[in-house]
């Protein structure tokens, strides 16, 4: 195949982006060639053609984002190669360059994204220590986490629902195994070595300004270099890195996030969905971060609660504020798109409309006395008002983006175009009078431009200055010097309007970039106001109460599960009291009685308090916990080759390793994944260890042997769920009371579940027979458990 200059250009650029699908702009299409074309054709279900024996597939340039989304979702990295000059102005081969590389984590366009964060994560490791840098390119947020605990790193990656992992080669296989559905890319070690990238990106004189470890600085440098590579930009929209540290935040393992249903996942209803009554995308993202990272500093928690309380106490102003916030747009992402030259005119309109709300919002905020005044960049607002149409149509260059009155030169060219039709009508009338041809017509098409059309019957009347341009079946088309001059002016006006609109739009965007710092500050303040006002709204709507903090006391009166109560009628409230003297609660009772719901609600109430939220209870006095741990449910880990019991023991090992006397531990049926005797033995030994450690523990179990702990340890208290029997009917009251369950009611639960009557009746027969045999053998009449006692009474 003969290689043309165009194909030489393509091959040269493709060589630089071997690992990407290259979409190569050719006129009105983006074309893919060779193997890329085959992939594009298959994924997008479009026709595969050929150009000079090279497989080729193309997509219209105006529909790029629609097709791009499908390619990225299919797991491909895509390099966009654009024409860098107008074809009409280039007599040689048009200059083309890659303008961005699109991956799941480098997307900034609105139509690709939901309101939630879109994190990529750079993961590095040195000598058993792990560092993860999370980045949402669409908002500029950067988070840094460092730990010697591999599982803690994996938990955070899972909690953040990352869309992309970037790592050195030696970590790829293990990360790919743990996160098989996440796009994972390896980068060379030199990405981690250029620490000057950090200094340049943040304009730092001293790289130690951020107080990050050498490992974290290397990972941050790798992130910056990668974002530069994908965005094809030297100036990045990255916020200063925020360190996720146990000194400031509670670290939640992925099991706890899942077991307490904190955020959207596989378990349906969750705490975030219940609390998320935010009015802005920024507020929703911040609220989710608060839920994933509760505070551990009592002063900071109480400051949030104070703000929420002020809002709750002034419902009229709260409603007014939330109404104003409902008109706020996603400033954070707009700023990012402007910074990376990906913004559209409607972004600037949305930015202006948001900023115009600030003066009125400041008036409302002043009534509460707990919020600082929002910055108001009046000059920028004035520029946006004058420059951008209120309802812009199309892209810059199409003549309907820049307002009239902003540029006198642009207005002149627009006037010329707007009066063109009128001028043509005048010209047409003049030519009819001059020639005497009443059916003479002036028209336009894209091939020949402007023309005068005369029927063949009138050809004898045409003047000498008419120059033939085209012959049709029944007519001829002509041009005159005057019409040619008019056409030149019109075409020049169209071209100049396109140039001017693009230039003016770019200049307005440059002005927005100059205000980036203040706009991001406004965005952060709006997010915080929205999140706090949402917590106040939740408190009012759901009848929550303000929690009070204590050194060691956990007292909840009339506690409710914040998620379950939203979808259940007549939810039963429950109380709990724990302190350093009584800090370990064993809860027995049948299935379906509400044991799991109860211990989860204690965890959720504690967590909600530490994000600064009011809580679902009549009264709540709580300690500030450093961690909340959970071991609940039965699940295996097929990808990791772990059985249900091994998963359970791994999670318990983590709890025993990490918990302190400031931790809350919630256990549900620990030990049931093995034989009864082994299970009870393990559960008892774990309980002893946690009692000695001083954690506050709620342990829901079917092992009645564990109720004997109360006789050996004064810190233990037994609770059960009250069950009422009316004839053959069993009523689960869901009420937690002191005591020990005397029956499991397993057969009754099976009956409620719809097991056939013949099976239920047979089960009763077997139960009765075993009961009689056990009574004869042991001389006891406890129908709850037929297990052999392992510990002295």
Swiss-Prot record:
The UniProt entry, under Gene3D superfamilies, shows: 1.10.1420.10, DNA repair protein MutS, domain I, MutS, connector domain, P-loop containing nucleotide triphosphate hydrolases
What CDD domains has UniProt attached to this entry? ABC_MutS1
Q: Does the keyword Transferase apply?
A: no
The entry's keywords:
ATP-binding, DNA damage, DNA repair, DNA-binding, Nucleotide-binding
Q: Which domain of life is it from?
A: Bacteria
Q: Which GO terms describe its molecular function?
A: ATP binding; ATP-dependent DNA damage sensor activity; damaged DNA binding; mismatched DNA binding
Q: Which GO terms describe its cellular component?
A: cytosol
UniProt keyword ATP-binding, yes or no: yes
**Cross-referenced SUPFAM superfamilies:** DNA repair protein MutS, domain I (SSF55271), DNA repair protein MutS, domain II (SSF53150), DNA repair protein MutS, domain III (SSF48334), P-loop containing nucleoside triphosphate hydrolases (SSF52540)
GO biological process terms, semicolon-separated: mismatch repair
Q: Which InterPro entries match?
A: DNA_mismatch_repair_MutS, DNA_mismatch_repair_MutS-lik_N, DNA_mismatch_repair_MutS/MSH, DNA_mismatch_repair_MutS_C, DNA_mismatch_repair_MutS_clamp, DNA_mismatch_repair_MutS_core, DNA_mismatch_repair_MutS_N, DNA_mismatch_repair_MutS_sf
Function statement: This protein is involved in the repair of mismatches in DNA. It is possible that it carries out the mismatch recognition step. This protein has a weak ATPase activity.
Q: Can you tell me which family this protein belongs to?
A: Belongs to the DNA mismatch repair MutS family.
Stored NCBIfam families: mutS1, PRK05399.1
The protein, known as: DNA mismatch repair protein MutS
């Amino acid at each position: 195949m003969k290689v043309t200059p165009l194909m030489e250009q393509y091959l040269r650029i493709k060589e630089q982006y071997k690992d990407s699908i290259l979409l190569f702009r050719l006129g009105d299409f983006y074309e893919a060639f060779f193997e890329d074309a085959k992939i594009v054709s298959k994924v997008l279900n479009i026709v595969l053609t050929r150009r000079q024996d090279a497989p080729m597939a193309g997509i219209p340039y105006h529909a790029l984002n629609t097709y791009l989304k499908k390619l990225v979702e299919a797991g491909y990295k895509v390099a966009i190669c654009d024409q860098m000059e107008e074809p009409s102005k280039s007599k040689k081969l048009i200059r083309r360059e890659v303008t961005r590389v699109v991956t799941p984590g480098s997307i900034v366009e609105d139509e690709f994204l939901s309101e939630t964060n879109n994190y990529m994560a750079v993961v590095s490791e040195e000598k058993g220590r792990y560092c993860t840098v999370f980045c949402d390119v669409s908002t500029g947020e950067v988070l840094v986490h460092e730990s010697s605990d591999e599982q803690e790193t994996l938990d955070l990656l899972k909690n953040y629902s990352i869309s992309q992992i970037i790592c050195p080669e030696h970590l790829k296989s293990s990360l790919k195994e743990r996160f098989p559905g996440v796009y994972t890319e390896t980068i060379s070690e030199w990405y981690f070595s250029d620490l000057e990238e950090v200094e340049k990106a943040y304009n730092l004189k001293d790289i130690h300004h951020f107080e990050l470890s050498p490992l974290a600085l290397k990972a941050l440098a790798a992130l910056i270099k990668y974002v530069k590579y994908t965005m094809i930009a030297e100036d990045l929209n990255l916020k200063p890195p925020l360190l996720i540290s146990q000194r400031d935040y509670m670290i939640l393992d992925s099991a706890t996030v899942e077991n307490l249903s904190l955020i959207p996942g596989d378990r349906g209803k969750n705490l975030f969905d219940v609390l998320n009554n935010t009015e802005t995308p920024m507020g929703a993202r911040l609220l989710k971060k608060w839920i994933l990272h509760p505070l551990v500093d009592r002063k900071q928690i109480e400051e949030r609660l104070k703000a929420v309380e002020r809002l709750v106490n002034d419902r009229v102003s709260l409603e007014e504020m939330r109404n104003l916030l409902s008109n706020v747009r996603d400033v954070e992402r707009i700023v990012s798109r402007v910074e990376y030259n990906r913004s559209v005119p409607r972004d600037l309109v949305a930015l202006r409309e948001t900023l115009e709300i600030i003066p009125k919002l400041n008036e409302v905020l002043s009534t509460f006395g707990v919020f600082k005044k929002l910055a108001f960049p009046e000059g920028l607002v004035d520029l946006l008002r004058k420059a951008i149409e209120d309802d812009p149509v199309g892209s810059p260059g199409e003549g309907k983006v820049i307002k009239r009155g902003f540029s006198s030169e642009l207005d002149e060219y627009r006037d010329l175009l707007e009066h063109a039709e009128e001028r043509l009508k005048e010209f047409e009338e003049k030519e009819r009078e001059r020639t005497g041809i009443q059916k003479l017509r002036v028209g336009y098409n894209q091939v020949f431009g402007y023309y005068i059309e005369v029927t063949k019957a009138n050809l004898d009347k045409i003047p000498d200055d008419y120059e033939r341009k085209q012959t049709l079946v029944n007519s001829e088309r002509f041009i005159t010097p005057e019409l040619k001059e008019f056409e030149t002016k019109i075409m020049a006006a169209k071209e100049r309007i396109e140039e001017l609109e693009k230039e003016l739009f770019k200049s307005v965007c440059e002005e927005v970039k100059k205000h980036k710092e203040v706009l991001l500050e406004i965005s952060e303040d709006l997010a915080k106001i929205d999140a706090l006002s949402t917590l106040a709204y939740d408190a009012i709507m759901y009848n929550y109460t303000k929690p009070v903090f204590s050194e060691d006391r956990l007292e909840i009166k009339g506690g409710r599960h914040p998620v379950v109560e939203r979808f259940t009628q007549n939810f039963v409230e429950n109380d709990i009291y724990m302190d350093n003297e009584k800090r370990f609660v064993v809860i027995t009772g049948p299935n379906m009685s509400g044991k799991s719901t109860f211990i989860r609600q204690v965890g959720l109430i504690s967590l909600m308090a530490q994000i600064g939220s009011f809580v679902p209870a009549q009264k709540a006095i709580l300690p500030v916990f450093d961690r909340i741990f959970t071991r609940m449910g039965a699940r295996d880990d097929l990808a990791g080759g772990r059985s249900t019991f091994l998963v359970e023991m791994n999670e318990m090992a983590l709890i025993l390793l990490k918990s302190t006397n400031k931790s809350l531990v919630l256990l549900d049926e620990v030990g049931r994944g093995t034989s009864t005797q082994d299970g009870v033995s393990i559960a008892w030994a774990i309980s002893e260890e946690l009692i000695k450690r001083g954690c506050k523990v709620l342990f829901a179990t079917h092992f009645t042997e564990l109720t004997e702990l109360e006789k050996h340890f004064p810190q233990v208290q037994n609770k059960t769920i009250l069950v009422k029997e009316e004839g053959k009917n069993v009523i689960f009251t869901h009420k937690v009371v002191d005591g020990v369950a005397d029956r499991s009611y397993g057969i009754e639960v099976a009956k409620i579940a719809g097991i056939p009557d013949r099976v239920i009746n047979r089960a009763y027969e077997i139960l009765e027979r075993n009961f009689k045999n056990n009574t004869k053998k042991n001389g006891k009449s406890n129908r709850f458990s037929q297990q052999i006692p392992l510990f002295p009474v």
